[in-house]
Structures are given as C-alpha cells and as structure tokens.
Amino acid sequence: MYDPQFEKYNQLLKLKEKADKAYYNGVGDPIMSDEEYDNLVDYMDELNPDGGVKTKVGASPSRSKSVKLPMPMNSLDKIKTQHEFDNWMKNWKPKAMLLVKEKLDGVSCLAVFTLEQNKPPKIELFTRGDGTTGTNITRLLNHGLKVGNDYCFDDMVNEDKWTTDWGCYLNAEAIDHWKKLPVKKVYIRGELIVTRKNFQTWYSNRFMNARNLVSGQVNKKSPDPKILQDIDFVPYDLVIDLKRPTMTHEVEHLLFRMIGATPVYTRFLFLSDTISTESMADYLERRKEKSDYEIDGLVIQVDDDTLFAPPDNRNPKDTVAFKIMGTTARTTVTHVEWNLSKGSKYKPTIHITPVSLSGVTISKVTGFHGKYISENKIGKGAVVLITRSGEVIPHIVSVISPAAKQDVLLPSNGVWKGVDIYYDGAEEPREITVKKMVHFFTSLGCLGLKTMTVGRLYDAGYRTVEAIVGADTKKLVLINGFRMVAQKLLPSMWVNVAKATPHELMAALNAFGEGIGLRKIQNIDCSKPEALEVIGMTKKTVETRIWPIWNDVLARVNALSRMAKSQLRKQETGSCEPEEDDDYNFGSYHPCHMPCQSSNKIWECRSRSPSAAGSASPCRPTKRRDDWFDSSESSCATETCVVESPPKKRPPMQGYVFVFTRFRDKDLERQITALGGKVLNNVNQNVTHVITKEKGPYKKPYTGKLKFALDNNLFVWSLVHLKSIVADEQEKLKRQRKCRARSPSPCGTACSTERD
C-alpha cells in the first residue's frame, strides 16, 4: 500500500546521503549549510523516529578508500532547547565540573601514535567517515602536514620522564599502567582546520570557506604542500587505553602541549541553575568572534573519570553538542516571482502561505536561481520546509511535495546560462536600466539617487548614466517635482563621479558583467591592460571579458569623468573651459583637445588659435588606436610644424602596492591610484608597503598584516608618513603641469604630449 509519508522520508533520505557525501567525503561543494542539515535531520526524525537518522552521522567513503577505524568515532547528541538541556543536566550530581569546548568546523580525524622503546614513532591518520569506517590519510604527513613534534614522542616512551618530570601530574596507577603496556598506543581525536586569519589572508579569494579548503586537500591525490603547512591539527580527545580511563582532562591538555599540539579552547564551569541555553548561546557568539578558528557550536562534557565508557558505536551520555538552531515550518507555495537584476539575470522569489518563524511572519523566501526552481519543481501547490535563523534571509530546507509540471513556470523570454536564466529580449527593459543606474550611483556613494528617484528620471527621458550626469539643471528644475534633484542631488553626485578612480567607475558601471567587481578590477594594471595575467581572474576571463571591450569601457569612463568635472566648473564659474591641471590620469580627452597624428596613439593638442597656415583644424587626424599607455613616440603634423613627443614618464607610485591595517581611507586610496599605485585589502606576495595608523615601535599583539610585513621585511609606514609622501608627489605633478602649460609649441598651440 502506498504510504505518502514513507515516500517523503525516502526522498529526504536520498537528499541527506547526498549532503553527507559532499560534506564528509569532499564529493563536490556542500549542498546545504550545517543549520539546514540539522533541520533536515530533525524533520526526518519526526517522520520516522525509528529510522536512526540522528545516530548515524557522517558518510562512508568509497569502497576503494575505506578502512575500518582503529577506534570508533561516535557522534554527539545535540541540545537545542532549554527542556532538553534541563533533562540532560538532571543526570549529573550538583556542582559537577563541566568542560565547554569549541566545536570546530573543520575535518574530523583520528591520529594513532604507536610508541616503542628505541624505535621512531609510527603515526597514522584517518578521516572520520561514518564513525566506523574512514579513509587513511597518513600520506599527507609526507607532504607537509604536521600533527605534533617528533622529538616529544621519545619522552613519552621514556619511563623516567613519566616518573620524574610528569609524575606530579599523573597518579601512580596511571604511571604503572602506562609502563606495563608492551606497545604504547595513543589515540587522539582532533580537527584539521585553517585559522581564520590565514584563510582570509591567503585563500578567501579562491575558496568558499576554510572547511572546503581543508576537505579539498584531504581528498586530493597530490595535495599542495604550501596549503598543508597552514593546516593545523587541533586535538580535543585523548585515549591511551580503549578499556579504561588513565588521566584527567587537565593532564590530557598537558600531553597535547607536550607533543607540540595546541588543544581546542576549553572553559571549565560548575553545573548550576544559572547555566541555560541562553547563557550558552551568548557564550557561543562571543567565542565565534574571538576564536582563532571557525566554530559552529559548543561541546559540553562532564569532567568525571568514573563516567568513562569504552568507545563504541553509541553516542556518549556524558557529552553533548550545543548549537544555535533556527526554527522550521512547513508551508505551501502560492507562486514564484521572477525579477531582473542589473546584469539581466532572472532572480526567483518564492511566495508562500504566511507562517510564523521565531516570532516573525514569513510570506516569501529566496529561490536561489533558475536551476533550483526547475530541478526541484517549485511552483504553485508545492509543499516546502523553510527555515529562518537570526537575521538570515528565509530559505527552503527541502521540497516535501513538488508542484505539478504545468505549475512550474519559468520566464518565457529567457535563455539558460549555467544555473541561471537571463533576459533575451531585443530591447533592454526599464527594470534593468534603472537597476544599472542605481548601482552606478550607490557604488560611488551618491546620496538620494535610489530606485524611486532614478525611475522618475528615466520616465522623464534621462535613460542613461551619461544623460543624468550631463543633465542641464536649468531645464531639470522646470520639471514638476525635480527641483531638489537639480539643486542638491546632482551637484553632490558630480563631486563623487569626478573624484572616482577609473577602477571605481568601471566597477560602478558593471562594465565587465556580473562577477567582476571592484576587488577584481583593481588588480588590472592600467599601464598594461592587455596583460593576460590578472590576480583573481583566469586567463580565459581576461581574454574574453576584459580585453575585447577595454577601449570602449575606457572611452566611456573618460567621458563620464570629463562630463562631471565640466558640470562642476560650469556650476562654479559658468564656463566649461578645462583648467590646466584637469588632465585625468587615465587618459581623458577634453572636448577642445584635437587628436594628433601618431603611429600608436592619440596625443592631446590644445588649440588656442588657428594655425599659421590658416587651416580650420590645427592638427590632421589620422588612424587612431587607444593604446593610451603605450610609451612610443608621437608627432603633431600640421602644415607648418612637427612636434616630437618626449617619452612618457613613469607614474610616481607605479609598482607600489599598499595594504592598510586597522583603518580604511577611501580618499587616500583614490589619490594613491591616481599616482599609479595600488591598494589591496589583504596581504600577498605583491605587497610592498603596510600602512599603520600609529608610528613604531608597534605594540603586541600584532595584526596579521603587520606581522606579515615584519616577517617578510616589507616597508611599514605610518599613515602620517604616507600622506606626506602623497602630498609631495601631487605637488610635483602640479608644478609639471604649470611648466608644460607655459611652453608653447612652434605652431602656436600648447601641446600636451605627456600624460600624468
């Protein structure tokens, strides 16, 4: 007989198995977060309490790699409510000591040390797998992974060391028991994990999270030794005899440190009525901020040796895991709304029958992308399980009952590109154009130019960024409702556009499409835009998305900057005549600049009067090419003169790569970029200077960036020192511009053959 509840359970079981393989065995990227996974398991347990989904945690590795673990690595029962916490605490005597450890979000493993007299220690390493079978990853120890210091193991098999040096920490029974073991085996459970600092410094631009980084190296046939050196083995449990306890947790931590490993952060608490899920949640949030590693919960253990139970396939009773969980609810989909992004991508929003989660009424959730809607058959009538935790956007945990085929509605005018659907119409809709313009202005910090205001400007005929930047305020103020826009918003917008760097303007225009924002664009060397190696982008991306449209993007950026400066001058002086120091550092062409004849580029020639020969145009335009940073020679050919251009000078800060630590300064970043330098968010091998707010000597603890600079002998400058150097270089450039302006060419025109 068909049982719909049993069918639902089997569907969710397949989803759980897929998630287990991705998370524990590194088969692809994780398909759901830890919270989504826990909610899925809870719901499956409600459907089938006898299914055992809560006791089986992990995934069996492939048969070719699986081995039986030397010691079972059982999971932990989870506590989520105060009622569950109270029931667990009733099992222990009052004033019992509790150990509260960080629950690290890494790759769980088991290290087995075999120690014998007069023999080098033998170390084996295993992944947890499903708790019974795992994978032998001992080979990683030959590629740079460290789980301890070898020289310490000699002391562990030295009976004198145990009796004299460590005797004050161990009881006589433990020492006697250890000495009688013919072959001494130490089992240490721990976590392979990368510190948050190292991940943010070196790997955040290449990997989704630290766990993906470690999992990928563990499952690689040829792991990267440099990455393995950054992976820490953090121990949290030590067993010497699988049948009996041998030491207290204080001694356990001492032994961890003696073998050269830093144990997991642990706090000791007395069991009392004041301990609650609320106090644990507060403590967890504090540890998430302070911990060296990513953590996803707490492990709470009773510190009592008499409770020791031989490791088996059952979850321990004296230890539980505490996590902050979001609530879940079942609801029905009413319809799917498709909205266009600024990049012409359709983004789905799923509307549902309103339900209450954590005291908040939820009526819609994110649909992720087109493939998610299509594959999961989400449409009118679909029954879904949703979740919400804290301020996280509500989303679907699982689809309990899919919609009928005819109710799964996708955009009719769309085309598939990967997992997304893109608009494929002949004309760009109003929705996309407005979002593009809003993104431009908000990216540059222009106040007041949001969706409603920009939409009204669009309806009034201002349908491009250029149209708004170049708007005539006298005409705009005559349109009903646009007085404040013309008098206040536009002038402040011109200031922001005028002072923006070329990279910021390109990013604001979304010039190279979605996925290539300011962080990646900043890595493009404007002096060599055709270079195929750009940090953060593949060679294919540069070849197909950057270089083919570089000149067009550059021309548009030049025009916008020139237009904004002209508007500001017009507002201040009533004239749009460019000033002598108005040349923008990335190749601007003023309206009164005429292109001069050149073999490789267009040089600028300011025309103040007709040429001596009476020609209408003082310069003869020739074939143009926009390689504006090429340093080849140029000449201005007229009927009466030929002006040879000097070679282009190197920008004063070209080759300087700065990183700021403990402060941000957008204006200073723009000034450095204008002088040819770069400012990065994180340190890497290209950084030349690290900038601090204070002058040396520097107080400990050092920031990660400062420590990197000191370890690698980089320049460390104070903010005051950097600002003085930038000011000096800017003053030099101003003097050079004035000098060039006073040096007329033989044809009676002031020729600017050198760009700053």
Swiss-Prot record:
**What GO MF terms are annotated?**
DNA ligase (NAD+) activity
Q: Which cysteine-cysteine pairs are annotated as disulfide bonds in the entry?
A: none
Q: Which PROSITE patterns match?
A: BRCT
Q: Which CDD domains match?
A: BRCT
**Residues covered by the BRCT domain:** 648-742
Q: Return one Gene Ontology term, BP aspect.
A: DNA repair
Look up the EC number in the record and give it. Answer: 6.5.1.2
Q: Quick one: where's region Disordered? A: 610-630
What InterPro entries does the entry give?
BRCT_dom (IPR001357), BRCT_dom_sf (IPR036420), DNAligase_adenylation (IPR013839), DNAligase_N (IPR013840), NA-bd_OB-fold (IPR012340), NAD_DNA_ligase_OB (IPR004150)
Question: Which Pfam family is one of this chain's hits?
Answer: BRCT
Catalytic machinery residues: K103 (n6-amp-lysine intermediate)
Compositionally skewed regions (Low complexity) per UniProt? 610-620
The entry's keywords: DNA replication, Ligase, NAD
Reactions catalysed, semicolon-separated, are: NAD(+) + (deoxyribonucleotide)n-3'-hydroxyl + 5'-phospho-(deoxyribonucleotide)m = (deoxyribonucleotide)n+m + AMP + beta-nicotinamide D-nucleotide
Q: Which domain of life is it from?
A: Viruses
Which enzyme class, named as a word?
ligase
Summarizing the function annotation, the protein's role is: Catalyzes the formation of phosphodiester linkages between 5'-phosphoryl and 3'-hydroxyl groups in double-stranded DNA using NAD as a coenzyme and as the energy source for the reaction.
Which family does the UniProt entry place this protein in?
Belongs to the NAD-dependent DNA ligase family.
Tell me what this protein is called. Putative DNA ligase 052L
Which organism was this protein described from? Answer: Invertebrate iridescent virus 3
